[in-house]
Curated annotation (Swiss-Prot):
Gene3D superfamilies: 3.90.79.20, Nucleoside Triphosphate Pyrophosphohydrolase. Its cofactor is Mg(2+); Mn(2+); Zn(2+). Residues 125-248 form the Nudix hydrolase domain. The gene is nudC. A divalent metal cation 3 binds at residues 174, 178, 219. GO terms for biological process: NAD catabolic process; NADH metabolic process; NADP catabolic process. Belongs to the Nudix hydrolase family. NudC subfamily. InterPro entries: NAD-cap_RNA_hydrolase_NudC, NudC-like_C, NUDIX_hydrolase-like_dom_sf, NUDIX_hydrolase_CS, NUDIX_hydrolase_dom, RNA_Hydrolase_NudC, Znr_NADH_PPase. A divalent metal cation 2 binds at residue 174. Keywords: Hydrolase, Magnesium, Manganese, Metal-binding, NAD, Zinc. This is NAD-capped RNA hydrolase NudC. It comes from Yersinia pestis (strain Pestoides F). Its EC number is 3.6.1.-, 3.6.1.22. Substrate binds at residues 25, 69, 111, 124, 192-199, 241.
């Protein structure tokens, strides 16, 4: 439920507009609303963090707007809450009017949804399921540089789940399309909400089965097998890609030790 702030409310403040996040001094604001001159604005509680309320305010600030990526190395829980806030703010901004009848909508008081009083249509935030997989071949891991990545970062393969696919089918298809190889021993590891803009990353590990590596130039700048102790520039800590790589490195090292 939304409320107008008096200035006495306290907690963490997620102020977001158009996928941007207010980060004065490079940090998420914390404390009383009055300390950040937020009194008089409309806010909605979207969770709790370390025993304090987390508030969402949907508006643009004159300065200090940044990316939720800046919170990646702060704390996973806080990053996820901030990501939720950014996604909700964008959802409500883009769902002011009903896509069926064109009438103005309002936010539900009981769930994350926008409601139309005219035709009774109900809209929920969009979530795009993605698969991401680390592939091992002996003491090597398959890493690639994606065309959309900057700074020379090499990472594992990933892609969106298509309509009618299982997660397992999506992994096998993406790997074959991007690298021309087949995999085996696919196993689920973990998941991570990824608000860029609204993905849910489902992480897997797999072993190489067959095929000659040949990367898809439309998706990848390059791809190669890297020995576990000779890795290129990797994704930052806090990302599910980095965890997959680190977990696979452990298996590569064990394989190398057994081979000696």
């Amino acid at each position: 439920m939304e409320l107008q702030l008096t200035g006495k409310e306290s907690g963490w403040w997620i102020v977001s507009h158009e996928n941007k996040l207010w980060l004065p001094k490079g940090e998420l604001p914390q404390g009383n609303a009055a300390n950040w001159s937020l009194q008089g604005t409309t806010a909605r509680q979207i969770g709790e963090w370390q025993g304090q309320s987390v508030w969402l305010i949907r508006q643009m600030m004159p300065s200090g707007m940044g990316s939720v990526r800046q919170l990646l190395d702060v704390d996973r829980g806080l990053f996820q809450l901030a990501g939720r806030g950014v996604q909700l703010a964008e959802f409500y901004r883009s769902h002011r009017f009903c896509g069926y009848c064109g009438h103005e909508m309002h936010a539900s008081r009981t769930e994350w949804a926008s409601l139309c009083n005219h035709c009774r249509e109900r809209y929920y935030p969009q979530i795009a399921p993605c698969v991401i997989v680390a592939i091992r071949r002996g003491d090597e891991i398959l890493l690639a540089q994606h065309v959309r990545h900057r700074g020379g970062i090499n990472t594992v393969l990933a892609g969106f789940v298509e309509v009618g696919e299982t997660l397992e089918q999506a992994v096998s298809r993406e790997v074959l399309e991007e690298s021309n190889i087949h995999i085996k021993n696919l196993r689920y590891v973990t998941s991570q909400p990824w608000p860029f803009p609204h993905s849910l990353m489902m992480a897997f590990m797999a072993d190489y089965d067959s095929g000659e590596l040949c990367h898809d130039p439309k998706e990848l700048l390059n791809a190669g097998w890297y020995r576990y102790d000779q890795l290129p520039l990797l994704p930052p800590p806090g990302t599910v890609a980095r965890r997959l790589i680190e977990d696979t490195v452990v298996l590569c090292r064990e394989h190398s030790d057994l081979s000696q």
